[in-house]
Amino acid sequence: MSEPLKPRIDFEQPLQSLDEPVLKSAQAFDEQAAEKFYPAAPELDAEDEEGRVEGLVNAALKPKRSLWRKMVTAGMVILGASVIAQSVQWVNQAWQQQDWIALGATTAGGLIILAGVGSVVTEWRRLYHLRQRAEERDIARALLVSHGVGQGRVFCEKLARQAGLDQGHPALQRWLASLHETHNDREVVELYAKLVQPALDNQARAEISRYAAESALMIAVSPLALVDMAFIAWRNIRLINRIAALYGIELGYFSRIRLFRLVLLNIAFAGASELVREVGMDWLSQDLAARLSARAAQGIGAGLLTARLGIKAMELCRPLPWLEGDKPKLGDFRRQLMNQLKNTLPKKDKTAH
């Protein structure tokens, strides 16, 4: 038997029609506007901000070329030309008069001058390479927002040669195998930053961790503050030299001083807020006084300063800017330092008893 029909249902209000979405009018971009478009990159904006602060600091500390400075430079140039002319005249007179002693002395002095000029040229070349690394980072920033094709691969292959990576290196082989003819410059540089650059960054991180641990242990176990200061200064200079060598930069005397100065300026002016943000609250929440002695806490502080120095040296020596999530954090090194100190100091106490 069939079921009875349901009664009719009357609605008090009429059914509301669904509102159709309002679509914006289509916008057409020409080729010139499309070339200027690039996605937002907060990490690159942060890099640009740090570079701007560093540039302002360097401009403020750079001595202005006054009139007296120009006069001294002109006088030194004239004096150098006069010395060269007088030396040529002495050599000519000694040769004509057969004064072999004067001729030998003049020749020895000329060789010393040539050696000094060669050293100056070598130092200038190394300083130029250090300055060129900053220009390469600017080129990399431009390529990371570029839609062009062809320049990214040439640029990355140049970076690989500077780093001493041959064609048989596994990371370089993976990068070459990942490339496709449809990739633009931004994608090529990003692949290089993710596949090849970490091979060098991991070595630099290991060096920073080792040097920071040595500084922390030295402060924790040594009772002599003067010896601690000298040791940390020496190890920090060694760390900067090591990081520069890993990234293919050969440092001379003046280039080493310039790099060390840039690192310290960057830490003092651009890194204070970041240091507080990464370590400050987490440091207070650890209650270090309950876990370690005051001397060990001082060692952790010295180790963190060494790690901070190494991170900024990495930033100045890397040919590429930091991408999102690539930059080392002090929190990682802090945890390593605490674990090493907790494992080392009890052993020393047991051996002492």
Swiss-Prot record:
<dbReference type="InterPro" id="IPR021147">
    <property type="entry name" value="DUF697"/>
</dbReference>
<keyword id="KW-0472">Membrane</keyword>
<keyword id="KW-1133">Transmembrane helix</keyword>
<keyword id="KW-1003">Cell membrane</keyword>
<dbReference type="GO" id="GO:0005886">
    <property type="term" value="C:plasma membrane"/>
</dbReference>
<feature type="transmembrane region" description="Helical">
    <location>
        <begin position="101"/>
        <end position="121"/>
    </location>
</feature>
<dbReference type="Pfam" id="PF05128">
    <property type="entry name" value="DUF697"/>
</dbReference>
<feature type="transmembrane region" description="Helical">
    <location>
        <begin position="214"/>
        <end position="234"/>
    </location>
</feature>
<feature type="transmembrane region" description="Helical">
    <location>
        <begin position="71"/>
        <end position="91"/>
    </location>
</feature>
<protein>
    <recommendedName>
        <fullName>UPF0283 membrane protein YPTS_2342</fullName>
    </recommendedName>
</protein>
<comment type="similarity">
    <text>Belongs to the UPF0283 family.</text>
</comment>
<keyword id="KW-0812">Transmembrane</keyword>
<keyword id="KW-0997">Cell inner membrane</keyword>
<dbReference type="InterPro" id="IPR006507">
    <property type="entry name" value="UPF0283"/>
</dbReference>
